[in-house]
Amino acid sequence: MALFQKKKYIKINPNRSIIEKQAEQPEVPDELFAKCPACKHTIYQKDLGKNKVCPNCDYNFRITAKERLAIVADKDSFIEMFTGIESKNPLDFPGYPEKLAATKARTGLDEAVMTGTATIKGQKTALAIMDSTFIMASMGTVVGEKLTRLFEYATTEKLPIIVFTASGGARMQEGIMSLMQMAKTSAAVKRHSNAGLFYITVLTDPTTGGVTASFASLGDIILAEPQSLIGFAGRRVIEQTVRQTLPDDFQKAEFLLNHGFVDAIVKRTELRQKLALLLELHTEVENV
């Protein structure tokens, strides 16, 4: 009898519409778009340009040492120096040699800083550029040695020097040998200064730890890119130590400018022109 027949039901997947919607979404290659960490806008990579600056809020994306070199130095003027120096893994830190090898292969760099000489609008200078894609540009024995040799070379050749900083601090895998580079580089900076030579530091995002507490803060003129994170200890560590809530803009370049730790904040698009002008003024003073 039809009255007692078992009813039949068709099961519908409640997530079907979501699954179909996801399936309909086109795959967009990551290299085509970037999301701005500041304003959260999705930006077409070509709109960022070679300076990698957000067109919506002027946020400065982090860039590699090679990208930095391309927008600052005159074309084909950079002569790299002090390559081939390698860490001996003084603490026998497990996995450290393998990590170094993998990072070198991925970045095409031999360490976290590029050192050499270049011209900027025709003005010759010694130049060092740190690269945060290389183990967060942490300062180990090789970084310290390359920077020290560059300062010594600049002192001998009577050259000004420009250093672009970007670092997470000392390299923990090298322990006290890493911390020693703070004193070593600072001494080299002092000898360069005693010779009456010109030193510019450009603080970029992020510049922290032992790098901030040594050569990064010793420039005759200290410039910074907008909104760069600059400090020694981390925000959370400081708040837990002093038991106070820090201002929202604490450790930002603008905060440091207002408190006298930075001489000027320069937009990335204007940095090449500003550096060339400073080098030119320094040269003119020398010739007086």
Curated annotation (Swiss-Prot):
Listed pathway(s): Lipid metabolism; malonyl-CoA biosynthesis; malonyl-CoA from acetyl-CoA: step 1/1
Subcellular location: Cytoplasm
DNA-binding listed as a keyword: no
Catalytic activity: N(6)-carboxybiotinyl-L-lysyl-[protein] + acetyl-CoA = N(6)-biotinyl-L-lysyl-[protein] + malonyl-CoA
EC number assigned by the record: 2.1.3.15
Coiled-coil spans in chain: none
Record-level GO BP terms: fatty acid biosynthetic process; malonyl-CoA biosynthetic process
Co-factor note (free text): Binds 1 zinc ion per subunit.
Domain CoA carboxyltransferase N-terminal: 32-288
Stretches that traverse the bilayer: none
Swiss-Prot/TrEMBL keywords: ATP-binding, Cytoplasm, Fatty acid biosynthesis, Fatty acid metabolism, Lipid biosynthesis, Lipid metabolism, Metal-binding, Nucleotide-binding, Transferase, Zinc, Zinc-finger
Enzyme class: transferase
One Pfam family of this chain: Zn_ribbon_ACC
Major place of residence: cytoplasm
This protein's GO CC annotations: acetyl-CoA carboxylase complex
Family: Belongs to the AccD/PCCB family.
Subunit structure, interactors included: Acetyl-CoA carboxylase is a heterohexamer composed of biotin carboxyl carrier protein (AccB), biotin carboxylase (AccC) and two subunits each of ACCase subunit alpha (AccA) and ACCase subunit beta (AccD).
Function: Component of the acetyl coenzyme A carboxylase (ACC) complex. Biotin carboxylase (BC) catalyzes the carboxylation of biotin on its carrier protein (BCCP) and then the CO(2) group is transferred by the transcarboxylase to acetyl-CoA to form malonyl-CoA.
Protein name, as recorded: Acetyl-coenzyme A carboxylase carboxyl transferase subunit beta
Annotated organism of origin: Lactococcus lactis subsp. cremoris (strain MG1363)
Gene that specifies this protein: accD
